[in-house]
């Protein structure tokens, strides 16, 4: 019917078009529902006219509108976005929101903190119970729930500390770029969290484009970008060895070149073509690749013999054991962070038996920075995987936009406990301590020993591929 009306018959003035626009908005909602009639900013004179005719405009009133503005901070992307009143409720979530009493044109959080804490930030609508008579006239109108303002959130992140972490990353990355050591680098990222509570104190990143001389802040990259971790996973690999019975306690194995039939040897940096008997603790301290590969071979149901061929009979079981163990620490699974949209890592479904060996020393699956932070926090706090969170407390809305009084705190959430006894956990903790603080010349983290605070840690170097305009650059990625 509308298509049958010729264009020349639709001849409205500018004022009439405004009336049609407002009327169409009014008709878009059900009876007794509230709708915000979108207009341009009203002048004081226009507001006065509406107020003077209030008795004639039953159900219509002038109200202040708002827009969400975030500060110019590197953390602003974590805040997320809010839908416009025109867009209203996201289509995919509309049904759930309507059940909770939302209106179709309510503005809601669509990403990150705004979405995660939507119900806290939104506030509550006034709920009325309206009855009508047979003629449709209002018989009674009772308020059964008073409306209230939304709450405020206080983050666990201190902006000054956050900036300090960003500056450190920026200085280090700038130095690497100047020394032509970061041509293919994707940047530098760091997450600082309280290992016992999960409170995130800083999540900082400096994103670098291949070949560029500059970089930019990228806090979101700590939860969305994945990286091949390298040797940092070796504490979890020991755990896989213990839980499967492949190794026991602080077992001594010989670090030696691993020669698989028709394949280049896998070696550790400190032995190369030689051999050295080392404990599990020293395997972490020195960052032994071949100790971990021998664990992987045992997971395959074999014992290492130079020149051997690998059996695929237990390939899936071995890879599952490694990945399930890594997941206990938070690698390859959701960390439980109070932000939607975090990556769970890149865990390829297709793999071969050689990938099982490289997985054991961190050269196959990829993880986010916050997953690796949760991994080391689980070791530091005595064996509990604690969900990280960036909101510390929820506060009432104070006067004039102030924080208000504390309403509730975000409690520590333990997701699982590690499959480690106290002796096994102690071996990993000692190994991480010795990485930095050992007197051995083979300790891989001695450069951090002069820090003013005591540090334990695990170093890792990933060997990956990078491409440029001339094709593919292969950085000696170890293959079998």
What does each model-found stretch correspond to?
Residues 1-146, 188, 195, 208, ...:
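Membrane-proximal periplasmic segments of bacterial cell-envelope enzymes
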Residues 34-35, 138-183, 188:
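Conserved, well-ordered alpha-helix/loop/beta-strand core segments that scaffold catalytic motifs
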Residues 42, 46, 157, 161-164, ...:
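Short amphipathic alpha-helical segments
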Residues 67-70, 162, 344-345:
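A short acidic, often aromatic-flanked loop/helix-cap motif at beta-alpha or helix-coil junctions
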Residues 86-89, 164-165, 466:
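Short helix/loop capping segments that flank catalytic or ligand/cofactor-binding pockets
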Residues 131-146, 157, 182-229, 236-480:
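Beta-lactam-recognizing serine transpeptidase/beta-lactamase-like catalytic domain environment
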